[in-house]
């Protein structure tokens, strides 16, 4: 098993805890907004919002953790989060369960994972280097 420093980019990030905290706030916001009544007028745009939201979450955390295994764990976690939220929405009187929403969430996660294999995964490292 690899030491923790091999999994975290945090060794390279001066403000790792800040970035992690912002990511956790993002996750909490997604849970809150997903489980409160919201009226989105264009139903098909809803799928784009789902993919973008889950893509942003995955893209954020890909910058904090390194390695295929940790990225796979993140991807599975975010996909399961999307499934859980959809199931919970099925019990909400003003929301509904939608398999296509789950698919859109997964597509967003997978696209961000793929993009995370590029230089994109170092944006926070580069941002911090500009500030020093």
Q: Where do the model's predicted regions map?
A:
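"…centered on the first transmembrane helix and the immediately adjacent amphipathic helix/loop
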Residues: 1-63, 74
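Alpha-helical transmembrane segments of multi-pass membrane proteins
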Residues: 29-34, 58-59, 78-85, 109, ...
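Short helix-capping/hinge motifs at transmembrane helix termini and TM-loop junctions
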Residues: 34-37, 65-66, 93-94, 120
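Interfacial helix-loop-helix junctions of multi-pass membrane proteins
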Residues: 40-47, 82-110
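Membrane-proximal cytoplasmic C-terminal regulatory module of class A 7TM GPCRs
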Residues: 118-132
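Membrane-embedded alpha-helical segments that form the functional core of polytopic membrane enzymes
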Residues: 67-83
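Membrane-interfacial alpha-helical segments at the cytosolic side of multi-pass membrane proteins
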Residues: 51-71, 109-120
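Short, highly charged low-complexity linear segments
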Residues: 13-16, 87-96, 115-122
């Amino acid at each position: 098993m690899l030491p923790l420093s091999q999994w975290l980019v945090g060794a390279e990030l001066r403000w790792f805890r800040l970035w992690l905290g912002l990511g956790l706030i993002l996750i909490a916001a997604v849970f809150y907004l997903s489980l409160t009544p919201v009226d989105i007028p264009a139903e098909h745009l809803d799928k784009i919002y789902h993919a973008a939201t889950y893509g942003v979450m995955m893209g954020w955390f890909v910058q904090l953790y390194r390695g295929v295994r940790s990225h796979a764990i993140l991807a599975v976690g975010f996909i399961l989060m999307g499934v859980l939220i959809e199931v919970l929405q099925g019990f909400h009187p003003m929301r509904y369960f939608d398999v296509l929403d789950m698919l859109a969430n997964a597509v967003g996660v997978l696209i961000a994972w793929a993009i995370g294999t590029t230089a994109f995964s170092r944006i926070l490292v580069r941002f911090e280097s500009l500030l020093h």
